[in-house]
């Protein structure tokens, strides 16, 4: 479930071997509550606001250190980026090529360890 929370950011990271089109299918239709967007069921919502939700993949799916990948999160704080890297490493993510982040949102993970379009929820 996702709850609007000012000044919070929820992050998912990992490695995906999907093509960009396959990767993007997961969030296709996210701003249309009548769509069958696959992310809706995983996130427990019927709408995802693209003003706050970002999907990112590295060029050509290049796998990079988690420290490099985390720089793509729009956290606007070096401390937050360092915290994301720390938690990612605690969850076994040392490198990757893809991430999602949702600004002003708190995600409550009902099934810890679940993959969301190949990505792990970081926090």
Region spans (language model):
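Low-complexity intrinsically disordered segments
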Residues: 32-123
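Short, extreme N-terminal segment that most often corresponds to the first beta-strand
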Residues: 1-27
């Amino acid at each position: 479930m996702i709850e609007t929370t000012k000044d919070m950011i929820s992050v998912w990271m990992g490695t995906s071997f999907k093509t960009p089109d396959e990767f993007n299918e997961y969030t296709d239709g996210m701003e249309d509550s009548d769509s069958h967007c696959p992310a809706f069921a995983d996130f427990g919502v019927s709408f995802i606001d693209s003003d706050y939700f970002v999907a990112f993949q590295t060029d050509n799916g290049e796998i990079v250190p988690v420290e490099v990948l985390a720089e793509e999160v729009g956290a606007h704080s070096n401390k937050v980026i360092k915290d994301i890297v720390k938690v990612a490493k605690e969850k076994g993510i040392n490198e990757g090529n893809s991430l999602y982040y949702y600004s002003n949102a708190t995600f409550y993970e009902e099934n810890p360890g679940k993959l969301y379009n190949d990505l792990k929820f970081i926090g």
